[in-house]
């Protein structure tokens, strides 16, 4: 729990246990060291990966992503989630990590082979799959002949980029916002926008536009010096208001589809929002609206009577990657290590309110997996650790 739920590193967990042991007057007798904790995590994670705790045999969907990388290594992960909408946006407790493998690159054929191996352990194919718009993943889904939902967040961001990325007004505004970084050491630093990301910029456009809208709405409250430096904001008021309205509409549609499930009813509500909020707007808004409508119609075609409400977001796997990044080695040449085996444990220990007694389960995990099993798994699924090779060569 200290590592998986609280986010402690094995070193930090060792110190926490030592403090607790001292405060509780030696109740633990002897607290484990960080290497022991790391070994326990690897054994438990491997057992969880190979012996799923949840029963999703009847119907499941698969979420895949290979967007996390360290150096020249890419990690491909497959998540198993309920095929039917769970009544809420997916959480870690709804998921099972069913496959992980590291490679230098992931072509469509390699992804297909990976998925074939994963599916063979599950008994039958998923009812549908969800992934981002990576060409390799899309092609792999075609080769596998799976129903394939394009993740709603990534796809909507792609549409926004298609409409605005090369638009002269947007390019000018984005450049002017970027130039405000020279104010970082001035008395106006408190008014600076958040840093614009170079990767997935259009997925993270909301904070920048929210900032622009806030400056615009409060421009009259700025002093003369501040107005001078941010005078480009009212000059671009039309574009800022347009983006703010469009992104609000997009966010509302995504909230419906994520929190209430993707269904014919959700599509109808999304279409209504688009027609009311975006169709009356400027040419760019109408172009974006058409792309959104086409997406909703195409994805609705993948729904079927038996499972009429689908999950359509891969946010949960992005959250999983976020938890992994917190425990990754800081040295890039180390690549991916056995620390990735902590990810399967998150579905068990993600909810502190869960009163389930996992002690017997964890005990079984530790007894069922050995260090030898972990070593074998690393040889099959991870690439050689170049940091170890460096130490050997330069010893």
Predicted regions and their residues:
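RNase H-like nuclease fold core
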Residues: 25-129, 135, 139-154, 162, ...
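Glycine- and acidic
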Residues: 1-3, 22-25, 95-100, 302-306, ...
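RNase H-like two-metal-ion nuclease catalytic core shared by retroviral integrases
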Residues: 153-178, 314-319
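DNA-recognition alpha helix
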Residues: 11-27
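Short, solvent-exposed positions on alpha-helices
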Residues: 11, 35, 334-335
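Acidic/histidine-rich catalytic cores and adjacent linkers
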Residues: 131-143, 179-395
